[in-house]
Swiss-Prot record:
Assembly and binders: Homodimer. Heterodimer of an alpha (TPM1, TPM3 or TPM4) and a beta (TPM2) chain.
Residues recorded as bearing N6-acetyllysine in the entry: 177, 215
Annotated coiled-coil segments of the chain: 2-248
Effect caused by changing residue 147 to V: In BDPLT25; uncertain significance
Name of the featured protein: Tropomyosin alpha-4 chain
Tissue-wise expression: Detected in cardiac tissue and platelets, the form found in cardiac tissue is a higher molecular weight than the form found in platelets. Expressed at higher levels in the platelets of hypertensive patients with cardiac hypertrophy than in the platelets of hypertensive patients without cardiac hypertrophy (at protein level).
Subcellular localization(s) per the UniProt record: Cytoplasm, Cytoskeleton
Entries under InterPro entries matching the protein: Tropomyosin, XRCC4-like_C
Gene name of the record: TPM4
Disease per record: Bleeding disorder, platelet-type, 25: An autosomal dominant disorder characterized by increased bleeding tendency due to decreased or dysfunctional platelets. Platelet morphologic and functional defects are variable. Some individuals have normal numbers of enlarged platelets.
Species in which this protein is naturally found: Homo sapiens (Human)
Keyword Transmembrane: no
Functional summary from the UniProt entry: Binds to actin filaments in muscle and non-muscle cells. Plays a central role, in association with the troponin complex, in the calcium dependent regulation of vertebrate striated muscle contraction. Smooth muscle contraction is regulated by interaction with caldesmon. In non-muscle cells is implicated in stabilizing cytoskeleton actin filaments. Binds calcium. Plays a role in platelet biogenesis.
Family the UniProt entry places it in: Belongs to the tropomyosin family.
Pfam families cross-referenced by the UniProt entry: Tropomyosin
Amino acid sequence: MAGLNSLEAVKRKIQALQQQADEAEDRAQGLQRELDGERERREKAEGDVAALNRRIQLVEEELDRAQERLATALQKLEEAEKAADESERGMKVIENRAMKDEEKMEIQEMQLKEAKHIAEEADRKYEEVARKLVILEGELERAEERAEVSELKCGDLEEELKNVTNNLKSLEAASEKYSEKEDKYEEEIKLLSDKLKEAETRAEFAERTVAKLEKTIDDLEEKLAQAKEENVGLHQTLDQTLNELNCI
C-alpha cells in the first residue's frame, strides 16, 4: 500500500514537473516571439535611420549646389560692378574731353571775334592793309573749318556719351537682377538648412529609439536564456525522477 502511495506521489510530481516544463516552454516561445517582434522593429528603425541619412546626404548635396550657384552669381555681380566702374571712369574721361573741346570752342569764338574786328579795320584801311586782309580771311576760313570740326567732334562725343549712359543703365539693371537672384539663393539656402536641421533632429530621435529597442532586445535575450536554463533544470529533475521511478 505504501508502495502505491509512493508511486502516486511520484506520478503527481512528474505531472507537476511536466506542467512546469510546458509552462516554461510556453514562456520561452512567447519570449522568442517577443524577441522576433523587437528585432523586426529594430530593423525597421534602422531602415528609417538609413533613409533619413540618405535624405540628409541629398539635402547636403542640394545645399552645396545652391552655394555654388550663389558663388557664381556673386562673381558675376562683382564683374558687373567692375564693368560699371570702368564705364564711370570712361564717362569722366569723355566729360573731360568735352570740357576741353568747349574751351577750344571758346578760344575759337574769341579768335573769330578778333578776326571780324580785324576785318572791320581792314575795310576802313582797305588799300593800306589789303595783304593783311587776305591773310586774315584765310585765317578766318581755317578758324571756321576748325569750328566745324569741333562741332562734329562734339556730336561724336555726345553720341559716345549716350552709348556709355545706355551701357551703364544696362549694367545697373543687370546688377539689380543679380541682387534679386542672390536674395533668392540665400532664401533657398535658409530653407535647405532648416530641412537639414529637421532631418538631423529626426535622425537623432530614431537613433535613440534604436538604442532603446536594442536594450529591450538584450533584456529579452537575457530572460530567454534564464528561461532556457530553468527548462534544462526541469528536464534534469524530470530525468532524475524517472530514473528513481525505474529503480523502484
